Swiss-Prot record:
HAMAP family: Ribosomal_uS14_1 (MF_00537). The gene is rps14. GO terms for biological process: translation. The keyword rRNA-binding applies. This is Small ribosomal subunit protein uS14c. Transmembrane segments: none annotated. It comes from Chloranthus spicatus. Keywords: Chloroplast, Plastid, Ribonucleoprotein, Ribosomal protein, RNA-binding, rRNA-binding. PROSITE patterns: RIBOSOMAL_S14.
Length: 100
């Protein structure tokens, strides 16, 4: 189980990313439209003004049940060992077992 502070930090980053999403997206499209280099630098400065934790690259996918940040399966939102346990216990409909 991941520490609660790490899970809270991820939640905070997700909120910040959603808050500043349109600012980042609009400034990125604006950079591509502007022909002059000096204007691009000004827009790039605006792009750097939001907090670092609002960047989508800083988000991690975490396991829904344990909070583990590694070996997550996107389709299920679970880490590998929890997924295996749930499949063996027939808790995930449609998932077939394999000998791994």
């Amino acid at each position: 189980m991941a520490r609660k502070s790490l899970i809270q930090r991820e939640r905070k980053r997700k909120k910040l990313e959603q808050k500043y999403h349109w600012i980042r997206r609009s400034s990125k499209t604006e950079i591509n439209k502007v022909p002059s280099l000096s204007d691009k630098w000004e827009i790039h400065g605006k792009l750097q003004s939001p907090p670092r934790n609002s960047a989508p690259i800083r988000l991690h996918r975490r396991c829904f049940s344990t909070g583990r940040p590694r070996a997550n399966y996107r389709d299920f939102g679970l880490s590998g060992h929890i997924l295996r346990e749930m499949v063996h216990a027939c808790l995930l409909p449609g998932a077939t077992r394999s000998s791994w």
